[in-house]
């Protein structure tokens, strides 16, 4: 089972709001997911990003691959750098 960390679209038409979820890569974008690890609201200025750092690091260590957008969000929050330091022992 290939696990991805990706965005699940919520909100109304023309007003997107996203949940950052861990899901099987074969499930639909807004379909079944394993766990919610955060939220992303691109409408606010500046964009509001809330991610549970412990859960994100746990899933990254277990081999979950982030989507391109989620990878950018994780790096903005400094989580990818912490994961890199944990993985390579710096």
UniProtKB/Swiss-Prot annotation:
GO terms for cellular component: cytoplasm; small ribosomal subunit. It comes from Geobacillus sp. (strain WCH70). Keywords: Ribonucleoprotein, Ribosomal protein. One of its GO terms (molecular function) is structural constituent of ribosome. This is Small ribosomal subunit protein bS16. The lineage of its organism: Bacteria, Bacillati, Bacillota, Bacilli, Bacillales. Coiled coil: none annotated. GO terms for biological process: translation. Belongs to the bacterial ribosomal protein bS16 family.
């Amino acid at each position: 089972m290939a696990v991805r960390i990706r965005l699940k679209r919520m909100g109304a038409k023309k007003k997107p709001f996203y949940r950052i979820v861990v899901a099987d890569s074969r499930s639909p974008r807004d379909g079944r997911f394993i766990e919610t690890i955060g939220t992303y609201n691109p409408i606010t200025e500046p964009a509001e990003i809330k991610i549970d750092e412990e859960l994100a690091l746990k899933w990254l260590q277990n081999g979950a691959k982030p989507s391109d957008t989620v990878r950018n969000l994780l790096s903005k929050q400094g989580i990818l750098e912490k994961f890199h330091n944990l993985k390579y022992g710096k």
